[in-house]
Amino acid sequence: MEKLILPRTNAIRAGLSLPTLSDLTDVVTHPPLTQEATAEPFEYPRDNWGSRIALIGPCSLDSPVSETPDWLASIDRPIVLVSTSSERQNDTALVTATIQALRDEPVHVVASVPTGVPAALAAPNTTVRQFISHAAVLERAVCAVTHGGMGVTQKALSHGVPVCAVPYGRDQFEVARRVEVSGSGTRLPSKKMTPNRLRAKINQARSMTAGARRVAEGFRRAGGAARGAELAERLLSRNAHPGPAAAPKSS
């Protein structure tokens, strides 16, 4: 990827009379401020980033939950949320496996399938929809089964809900690893997924609420979008009102 992107990036920079980059990491380490939408303990401890990189935590776009939908209010069991990618990556099997894994468990599965709900997804203790308010469900969830997407995984952890991450590709493998390392849930590679293995990983994750709450507290302390805006405004204000130039030295 670096061989593909770096020459094109440097060509754009040359047209703007900017110095060339020797490494793609320069993209985030050279600017006066880079904001990362995560925070410790979900982010690994770093001691070499300096003040240019700010961990501000997740920036949720969800509206506050004003009232619980009737279908959600009617569920009287602990809820396990399962969510798949909004990109087509053939991960509907995650919903199918979760339904099979928890068919005889005293829980209710709420699944969101943004790419479209297959007709075959049905079970007595299951609600499947194309789109749902994750925030409303997470207020009552005891576990979230995710494809390892950074958005839904951090959203669950922001609510203190432990995660069972089943990654399929790209950054999802790293997100799932962070779930495991932070003690906020479990990881199960999709290629090794069976209903029995998934059930075991979900039940293990359900015992890790304390770890999920630690991550939630770390996110809360980071400040989110409000702190990000404050840092950006501070930088812009400093650049708009630079300090007085040094007086010339007398000869």
Question: Where are the language model's segments positioned?
Answer:
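Nucleotide-activated donor-binding/catalytic signature segment of Leloir-type glycosyltransferases, i.e.
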Residues: V113-I132
